[in-house]
Every structure is written in C-alpha cells, then in structure tokens.
Amino acid sequence: MPTTTTSAKKHQERWQEIVSDPHLRELPYTVETNYRGQIVLSPHQADHSYLQGDIIGFLYEHAKEGRPFPEFPITTDEGVKVPDVVWMTARRREEVDGTGDPPTLAPEICVEVMSEANDWDEMEAKIDLYRKAGAEEVWVVEQDGTVRFFAEDEQERSTLVPDFPTSV
C-alpha cells in the first residue's frame, strides 16, 4: 500500500490550497497538478461527459461489489492526477481514506477517457502512475468509445469486471 511520503505531503498540501481557492472551484475544467505543484487544466467536450456517465452507469449495474466515482483525485509521484472514473470496493475505500487527502492509494480501477488534447504518451504515463499508486487495472477509453484494459500489461478484458464491454 502506498504511504504518504514528504513529496506526497507537499502534493496533498498544494491540492488543499487549490481546492480552497474560490476562484479555482468555479473553473469548468478538470484540474490536476504536475510534479512541481503547478495547475494543469483539461477542458473537455460534452461527448467526454457522456462517456463518463455511460461507464459509471455500467459499473453501478454490473460491478455491485464496489462503487464508481467520477473525477477522483489521487496523489502520485508526479502530482495530483484525476481519473475520469474510478471504481473501488468498500474495503479499498477504507484503505484509500487512510492515506490522506487526496489519497496516495488508488482505487482498484482507474478510467481515463481520452479527448483531442490527450495522446498515448500521456496515457501510458498515467497508466504507470495509477498502477504505482495501487490501481489493479487502468482502463483507457479512446474517443471512438473503444476501451483498452491494462494491468501488468494490456489485456483483452477486465479481470475485475469481466462483463464490461470493449466499446462504450
């Protein structure tokens, strides 16, 4: 289980500054930070939100032993990252909650929905960061709705939610 290091503490403290700023709370973007604590803004189009909603709905319906959450912040070695959707069991949630805010332990599944602003170099970096933070699987949804599943390596289907479709 990832622990809270000095670097993680700095990222968590910076994140608390950001979420406490009333001007930043009103931004219509996903907010993340890089390894220096600088704010990274990611605007997205409506299709992105539709895909997030579809993923959350499917997880509620077919992965009842856990619960999905949208835009969940995770403290990583490279700053605070915010997967579009996460899924975790109640047991993992207790563990996650014990690692600070934002947590240093990732939920079991982290999902990134790609937009025009993303490329595969960024996705591969996020897959690595989420896995290092404890995610068992990372799913990447391409703009056409194709879902790619990653654990140690890329896999054809999710092992945690085997009924999840390969396209949404």
At which residue positions do the language-model features occur?
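Gly/Pro/Ser/Thr-rich low-complexity, intrinsically disordered segments predominantly at protein N-termini
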Residues: M1-V168
